[in-house]
Each structure stands twice: as structure tokens, then as C-alpha cells.
Amino acid sequence: MVNFTVDQIRAIMDKKANIRNMSVIAHVDHGKSTLTDSLVCKAGIIASARAGETRFTDTRKDEQERCITIKSTAISLFYELSENDLNFIKQSKDGAGFLINLIDSPGHVDFSSEVTAALRVTDGALVVVDCVSGVCVQTETVLRQAIAERIKPVLMMNKMDRALLELQLEPEELYQTFQRIVENVNVIISTYGEGESGPMGNIMIDPVLGTVGFGSGLHGWAFTLKQFAEMYVAKFAAKGEGQLGPAERAKKVEDMMKKLWGDRYFDPANGKFSKSATSPEGKKLPRTFCQLILDPIFKVFDAIMNFKKEETAKLIEKLDIKLDSEDKDKEGKPLLKAVMRRWLPAGDALLQMITIHLPSPVTAQKYRCELLYEGPPDDEAAMGIKSCDPKGPLMMYISKMVPTSDKGRFYAFGRVFSGLVSTGLKVRIMGPNYTPGKKEDLYLKPIQRTILMMGRYVEPIEDVPCGNIVGLVGVDQFLVKTGTITTFEHAHNMRVMKFSVSPVVRVAVEAKNPADLPKLVEGLKRLAKSDPMVQCIIEESGEHIIAGAGELHLEICLKDLEEDHACIPIKKSDPVVSYRETVSEESNVLCLSKSPNKHNRLYMKARPFPDGLAEDIDKGEVSARQELKQRARYLAEKYEWDVAEARKIWCFGPDGTGPNILTDITKGVQYLNEIKDSVVAGFQWATKEGALCEENMRGVRFDVHDVTLHADAIHRGGGQIIPTARRCLYASVLTAQPRLMEPIYLVEIQCPEQVVGGIYGVLNRKRGHVFEESQVAGTPMFVVKAYLPVNESFGFTADLRSNTGGQAFPQCVFDHWQILPGDPFDNSSRPSQVVAETRKRKGLKEIPALDNFLDKL
């Protein structure tokens, strides 16, 4: 089993230049877990015979059954580079042994919050792409997240065995396929990255540099251009140059790699490389990549799969492959696996690519610090993170909770960015709502134990220095999902993670047996801990609601709740979609509300946001924490706001960060600042529970036009102003043509050409519309992209499969909010049905009349 001890790992942990923290990310079913296996078996944790079948990192029973990864799992590997390979590393290094902390993450879009949590604690990412289906929606989503977190990508083209055996591609076609995938990935990187002048420099991937791997995870073989360049350099050197020193050799190999990709051709007649596709004699020359790399692979496949015994024996001898005695008698696919695995072992190729091209914590924390840390860029904590200093103050980010074997307890899983964490150390545990100088969300407690995560096992360890990934015992009572752990008194929080999906699907749950209610509540608390994304809400009516990213996500959550967290039988409602409320025009009257004691008056109007502003707020381009003038300039330039008004934004809401704005455009009002807090509180309340059906508001700008206040402070307290502000906000919404917004999924469907018609049928029935259709070049597959309301998406997958004979594979991602056409006050319209259903579910009466909110002078 594990062939190195905890002490050995601990010794390397101090060599922070030799640590690599990386995650494996990709579209669903592109083979992350299978590839991870070949890495794990190389580092001596699975017996190599079973690699490719165990999916070691799929630790849960349901992951093994469904063949999907649900939770991201961490594992530490140890790899030693040979002296020759060390010369390829361009950053600082310390000895030949490397510690690789690898996190296998799920590819299914419903679990992309798990990916976000994994990305936060790593510095590099291995992006896996299936070379048959190419770059998909989820590849793009995850890669975009990685680049936003300043994580350096390397690419792996997986499933080459399929390209050769199923699609039967020619070498040139295969080269074009690879070329296209590399281009697609680079387009995504350059779109979302910061360019070459940014702090990370150039992070584009390029086969010539060795940042692209090719291979097959299932068969356990892989290579980068470096492997072949080394073979050829050795071959040419054998012809008479004598021995090369390691550094010269590295230089030669790098030159060779440049010749093996792109428009470079090889003339087999005289063994020379040329840049033109025709030889001096006018013969058409083969591309070097096809001739020197793909051709030998094709020959091996051809000889073995067509049972050509003599040819196979010749090739094995020529390639110098040593087979075990039991492998010699195999034929067909088993022999192919054995030969390829011996000739181009996947573990070596990938681990070399990871150690050579991904950054160590020392390199990465320099440019990631400003994204990770909220405090000033020059305090002790920030300096400790930037220099990755084990003697600095402890700064550690907990990105998620991992359930232990013992019910209801969790390991806190995270990464040490600065300092040293050890068993028994007294630390400050800061939740996401902590603000420096306040007591809220802060605990001072000792750490009970520090442990090392090993896939399905944990190993106790004394202490862990910065740059490493670690689990803590005994912190789980004080944190819900994420948080910062530090020993520095004036430390600010590490920045909260931004999820690329939002929980839009909800289910109400109740215990079948009412006596089990306390267990259900306890179970919901544990569920909220164990999943970074899920929200557990208790409605005013006493309902327990679970909100998740989609059907599959909710299904897994409910199963966990029933079996692991609450351990009781549960009844669940049908899934319900959350809506948002908005307005479509400016209020047609200036709305006035008087306070209950009739001494104060507020005048307001509401109007809709310009297109794109709500999305900017969601992304954090415009936020409450920004510098005032900078924000005003942005709004004025991009959305043509009046600069004076843009400077007087009071707040965002709901929760102080949401996509609604309260601006003050009053002129010369007395005592205005004294009631500001009360109006803001009313605004937060109103935007959280809108006028139509108490859903959140979105994309509404409220303007305070005028305020008349009583001169005596006692008559304008919070009790007078807050409800008045809320009534006034409601009135201004109801007079501004209110509308409902529904969430929309972006659906990507992969299917053969002949079933495209069936897809259109299903989408039209479900109010979806197709906006792009393209053929995947070099394959008979079509990709259809469509928008589909989340409300209609339940059972969509099953419906689609039955209409296309199971040949279409849909993938849904939450994309945007869209206005539901129709007036909520017109009884025959769709929005009015939704409003009625929602109000009935929440136990509310019908929409109150405008007169309840609007007062006469």
C-alpha cells in the first residue's frame, strides 16, 4: 500500500519550492478520476494492475455505483524527478523529491461548487479534455473559474484509444483535432485571463513547451512531446555525438520539441526536418507530429489489434519494451494495454508535466495573495502569504468540511498559506461574516489534531508548514462551511469564494414521523456543512427548504440527508424554482408614504436597471466595497448614470450585496443622515421580500426624491421610519409595471445528426429555444445549445433520452435571469399563476392593493 511514511512526507513539506498543489478539472465523463488513478499508482498507492478501474478518489459508495465523482477528494503523492528532468524546471527547486497534493474534482455541473472549493486551495490545474468530444460547456465554466482564481492550467487530451479504435482517424485528422482543442482552450484562457503583461505572465498552453499531454487514462498510457523528443535526441546522439551533460541534453530536447508540432515536416528520405510541406523533389512530406509520434503509436495499435504476431514481436523489440512473463501470452486489447503502459506510462508523463510546469506555493502565492486576502496588502498576514513564510503568522483558509466516519463530525479541509499549523495550537477561527475589531463570528480555540488526507484514509501528523493542504479536527463546531484560521490578531478574512452556479431549485422536506423533527433539524445543519453550495432555509411558515443547483445535486443532498446526516425517513415536495421580482418601467407617480405617527413623509420612485448592470453586480465588478469615485466613474461610463447620483448610492440589497440599488437624489434635506440607517434597513427588508410574492428583487433602482421629517428626534426613530420606507418602496414597485423573472438554464446537448429533430421537439414543448447548432469537426456529433427555463427542466433529461433513443446527452448550467412575459395582475397570464401558487405555498393572502402602501398628502 502506501510506500512512504508520514515522516518522509513531513520532511518534504518544509521544502516549499518542491510542493505542487493541483486539482484535476474537466467536463463530466472526460475521465478525471481514471487519470488520477494512474498518477496515484505511480506514487505507489494502488497496485498498478488495477489502475484505471479503481477510481481511487471516488470514495463514496454512490460515486462508485453511478460512476461519477460527487465530492472533491484530496490525496498526497510523492514523485522523484531524474537528474535530467530537473533541468526543465524554470522556478526555484530544492532536491529531486516532489510532494504533489492532488485534488480530484467532480465534472458534473451540479457539483461545480465542489470544484470552486478545490480550486481555492490549489495553484495549478490539470484540465482534462476528451479528444473525441472536445471542449464542452463545463470545461469552459471550470477553466474560467480557475483563471479567475489565478490558477495555471496544463492540458491533457484523454481518450486517445477511442479516437484510434472507434473513430479510426488518420494521423493528420487526429493532429487537426488536437490543434483545434488547443486553440479552443487558449481562446478561453485569453478571454478570461489577464494577458501576458499580467502578474502571471503567459499562461497559454502549448504542446511545444510541454504543457499539453496526450494519452488514454483507461489504458494507462500518456505522453507529452518531451518524452518523444528525448527518445529521438537519444537516438541521434547514439549515432556519434557521445555523452551529453544533463543541462546540454535538456537544451537539445527543448529544441527537438519545437520541431515536433505545428507546420514542421519530416523528410524520411534523408532524415531532415523542413518547414515546407513538399520536398525539393516535389514529394509531399508528412508532418513531424504525424510521422514521428503518431505513426509509431498507430503501428502498435494496428499490429496488436489485427493479431499480427511477428510484426508485434518486432515492434516490441524495436521499442525496447520489457513485458512481464504473464503479459507475453495476451493478445488483442489486454496486450495493447500492457504494451502501451510499458512504453509510455501515464503516471510518469503526467507527473513530469505537473512538476515541471505547475507553480510551487512560493511562486504562486506572490501573485495570488491580492486575490486571496481581504486586508491591506502590506500587513503581516499579507507579507506572510506573499513570501509563503513558515515563520510568519498562521493564515489558513478552510474551503470545505469533509465528513468523518463518526456521525456528525467533520474534518475542516483547507490550505496553510503562511505560518505553521500544529496540534494543540490556540487559534482565532473566523467565519465569513467576521469583521476586524468586532466579536461576531470569531472563536478562540485550540486545534485538537492535524491530519493528512489520503483519499480514503487519514494519517495523523504533528504539524504542517505553509504551502500544504491539511485537515483539522475539532474546528467543525465553529465554522459552517468555510472560514479563516489565524494567529494574527489584526488579520482580515481570506476572500469568500464566488460560485459559478447559484442555488435556484428548492425542495421542501419534512420528517415522515413528526417525533423525528429534532433529528431533521440537526441533519439539515450537518448537510449545510458538508456541501459548499447547498442552502438550508427555514421559512416563516415553519417549512424546511433545501436549495441546490439542480435536480441531481438535490437528489444527492436528500440521499445524504436521509442516510448519513439525519438518519430518518423523509418526505419531500416536488422541486420548486425560485423567482425574482423586478420592474419594467419607471414609476408613473412619485410615491409618498407617511410614517405611522403622520409626522414624516418619504417620496420615492423605482426604475429598472440598464441591461447588464445586475450581472456586473453579481460578478462583483460593481460592489458596495468599491472605492466611491471609481464606482461612480464606472457607472457613468458604462451605463450612462449621472455622476452626481452614482456617487450617492446608499446601499446594495438584499444582504448588502444584491443586485438592487438605493440612491439618494434629494436636494438639501435636513436630518437626512439620521434616518439613513432606518431607510437602508427598510430597503434590505423590501428587496429580500418583494411586493408580489415575497421573493428577492433583482435589477431595481430606487431613488429617494424627497423627505420631510419631524424636527424632534424622538418622532423619527427606527420604528417610525423602517416600515414607512418599506411601504414606500413597495408602492414604487407596484406603480412601475412589476414583472417576475425566472432562472434560465443554458443546455448543451451532444447528439448524432439524425436525432436533432427530436431535440427541437422536446425543447419547443418546454418553452426552450435553440440559439446555436454546430457540428463537432471530424465527428458525426452535433452540439445544440439552447436556453431552457429551470421551471421546465424537471424530467427534461429523461424526456430527451426517450425521444432520441438515448443518444442525446444534455448538460444544464444556470445561465441568467429572464423576465417572464405577461402582467402579474392580469388573471389569465402565466406570471399571475406563478404569483398565486407561490403565495399559496407561503401561506400569504392575495397581493395587497396599492392603496395599502400609497398615501395621499
Curated annotation (Swiss-Prot):
The family database entries (PROSITE patterns) matched by this protein are listed as: G_TR_1, G_TR_2
Phosphothreonine is found on 54, 57, 59, 435
Residues modified to Diphthamide? 715
Instruction: Show which residues form the site (Cleavage).
Output: 586-587, 605-606
Subcellular localization, as worded in the UniProt entry:
Cytoplasm; Nucleus
Q: Which positions carry N6-acetyllysine? A: 235, 239, 272, 275, 439, 445, 619
| Catalytic reaction annotation | GTP + H2O = GDP + phosphate + H(+)
Name the EC number(s). Answer: 3.6.5.-
Keywords associated with the record: Acetylation, Cytoplasm, Elongation factor, GTP-binding, Hydrolase, Isopeptide bond, Methylation, Nucleotide-binding, Nucleus, Phosphoprotein, Protein biosynthesis, Ubl conjugation
N6,N6,N6-trimethyllysine occurs at which residues?
A: 525
Covalent cross-link Glycyl lysine isopeptide (Lys-Gly) (interchain with G-Cter in SUMO), where: 322, 529
Task: List S-S links within the chain.
Answer: none
**Boundaries of every tr-type G domain copy:** 17-362
Annotated residues that bind GTP are located at 26-33, 158-161, 216-218
User: GO cellular component annotations, sorted alphabetically?
Assistant: cytoplasm; cytosol; nucleus; ribonucleoprotein complex
Show the InterPro entries listed in the entry.
EFG_II, EFG_III/V, EFG_V-like, EFTu-like_2, G_TR_CS, P-loop_NTPase, Ribosomal_Su5_D2-typ_SF, Ribsml_uS5_D2-typ_fold_subgr
Q: Which GO terms describe its biological process?
A: positive regulation of translation; translational elongation
Sorted alphabetically, which NCBIfam families does this protein's record hold? small_GTP
Family membership, please give it.
Belongs to the GTP-binding elongation factor family. EF-G/EF-2 subfamily.
As for what it does, the entry says: Catalyzes the GTP-dependent ribosomal translocation step during translation elongation. During this step, the ribosome changes from the pre-translocational (PRE) to the post-translocational (POST) state as the newly formed A-site-bound peptidyl-tRNA and P-site-bound deacylated tRNA move to the P and E sites, respectively. Catalyzes the coordinated movement of the two tRNA molecules, the mRNA and conformational changes in the ribosome.
Q: What is this protein called?
A: Elongation factor 2
Source organism per entry reads: Oryctolagus cuniculus
Q: Which gene encodes it?
A: EEF2
